[in-house]
Swiss-Prot record:
Annotated InterPro entries: I/U_nuclsd_hydro_CS (IPR015910), Inosine/uridine_hydrolase_dom (IPR001910), IUNH (IPR023186), Pyrim_hydro_RihA (IPR022975), Ribo_hydro-like (IPR036452)
Chain's gene name: rihA
Summary of the function given for this chain in its UniProt record: Hydrolyzes cytidine or uridine to ribose and cytosine or uracil, respectively.
Gene Ontology cellular component list: cytosol
UniProt keyword annotations, A-Z: Glycosidase, Hydrolase
Molecular function GO terms recorded: purine nucleosidase activity; uridine nucleosidase activity
Protein name, as recorded: Pyrimidine-specific ribonucleoside hydrolase RihA
HAMAP family for the chain: Pyrim_hydro_RihA (MF_01431)
Active site: H240
Length: 311
């Protein structure tokens, strides 16, 4: 039986590729997709979800737009990484269908209520929508199997010295998620910076030769440019968000540890930092499965294998 999931995302090149991977995988049943503001403005990320589902010929999946700003802060976007549209690079189709009239939280709640089994929430943007769901529907917590997020880091940040972008945008929301009591799986920079796509991998995807693999290669062409900056020390481009879906499909290619994680919401220098109690110093019980390593080649091979689905 396929695993039911809800995807909450802010496309974003790597979010778009996470959608491609999820919808090429029969092990997963994508029951709904919601959009969050982050990589671009809320209007653009919602439009990008619709564009990707139009491309993938999946207008049957319910879509709803989410919160227009973080819980307690003004919105920060990453247009320097993802371009003016949020998905600069390839020529993507215009949306062929409209989102639902309700909010992301309403769609998530409806999906959870109607599901015969607990649903996994995959969140690849800021945690605003998920936190709003948890706060407004405590009766539905038992319908959530786990929350798999791309966000945070045990080590260095990528938006500030201490903070990863998704958590930095809405640290209060992330803290609600981590302290919810629901199992959390964290794909932070410790693992996603190892899930790099090299130039040769992009050509491998392009050579698969179907329309979707070509679009993925073109998305990566654009994404690759930002990560050429020598400050990062990367060989390729880290494919952050697909790590969440890849973990659901092939957990054996990832190394994880069980640890307590908290989010710093007020620090002068560390606002948005995920504090991972690696050495069990706080006495707090672990609340998260934290990814720390990945078999990079296995990750690339999984992407290439699933791109064949679109032949």
């Amino acid at each position: 039986m396929a695993l039911p999931i809800i995807i909450d995302c802010d496309p974003g090149h790597d979010d778009a590729i996470a959608l491609v991977l999820a919808l090429a995988s029969p092990e997963l049943e994508v029951k709904a997709i919601t959009s969050s503001a982050g990589n671009q403005t809320p209007e653009k990320t919602l439009r990008n979800v619709l564009r990707m589902l139009t491309l993938l010929k999946r207008p049957d999946i319910p879509v709803a737009g989410g919160a227009v700003k973080p819980l307690m802060r003004e919105l920060i976007i990453a247009d320097n990484v993802h371009g003016e549209s949020g998905l600069d690079g390839p020529a993507l189709p215009e949306p062929s269908f409209a989102p639902q009239s309700g909010t992301a939280v309403e769609l998530m709640a409806k999906t959870l209520r109607e599901s015969a089994q607990p649903v996994t929430i995959v969140s690849t943007g800021p945690q605003t929508n998920v936190a709003l769901l948890l706060n407004s529907h405590p009766e539905l917590h038992t319908k959530i199997a786990r929350i798999v997020i791309m966000g945070g880091a045990m080590g260095l940040g990528n938006w500030t010295p201490a903070a990863e972008f998704n958590i930095y945008v809405d640290p209060e929301a992330a803290e609600i998620v981590f302290q919810s009591g629901i199992p959390v799986v964290m794909a932070g920079l410790d693992v996603t910076h190892k899930a790099q796509i090299h130039a040769a991998d992009i050509e491998r995807f392009r050579d698969i030769g179907n329309p979707i693999s070509t679009i993925v290669a073109e998305l990566l062409d654009f994404f690759f440019e930002y990560h050429k900056d020598e400050k990062w020390g990367f060989v390729g481009a880290p494919l952050h968000d697909p790590c969440t879906i890849a973990w659901l499909l092939k957990p054996e290619i990832f190394t994880t540890v069980e640890r307590w994680v908290g989010v710093e919401t007020k620090g002068k220098y560390t606002q948005g930092m995920t504090v991972v109690d690696y050495y069990f110093l706080t006495g707090n019980k672990p609340n998260a499965t934290v990814m720390v390593d990945v078999d990079r080649q296995g990750f690339v091979d999984l992407l290439a294998e699933r791109l064949q689905y679109y032949a």
